[in-house]
Amino acid sequence: CPYGMKLYAMQWAMEQGHQSILWLDSSAWCVKYPKVHQDAMARDGYYLVGNGDWKADQWTNDACLAHFGLTREEAAAIPLVSGGIIGLDFRNEIAREFFRQYAEAMNAGAFKGSWTALPEEGSGERYRGHRHDQSCASIIAHRMGLFRHPEQTYDYYYQPTMPDTVEIALAGL
């Protein structure tokens, strides 16, 4: 699964001695120094932002749900986090445990699946496809009791005029 590259990149950065890592997908860029992100990572051990009102039951295939021992009904209570912005401060046990579970899910094949709703991968009227690492990160964050940092405050879908609080802008490529 290509989304495993995020974990390999984070692992490599840790091996190079970096302790605080802010992953940004290629569609995200800093519009100013990410101080709020860095401060949150230092304070909380992580930075996770929500992904609208989407829930894990909508974007997680049956195999991934089975890996985590969840039903689709249980997953309906789990909000999605964005896979495009993930910050971890590995000096914090919370970040290390999140990463451990994230890597375990990747190694178990839970990232694998189709972006579109294939009947052989998912069931239920609400199922729309699989979001790979994002689905796993959402379930892990929920189980660990991690909160989502504010949406559309420090991270914003690009517009010509954005709030002064925005540090990272997102736009499709």
Residue ranges of predicted features:
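Glycosyltransferase catalytic domains, chiefly GT-A lineage
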Residues: 1-173
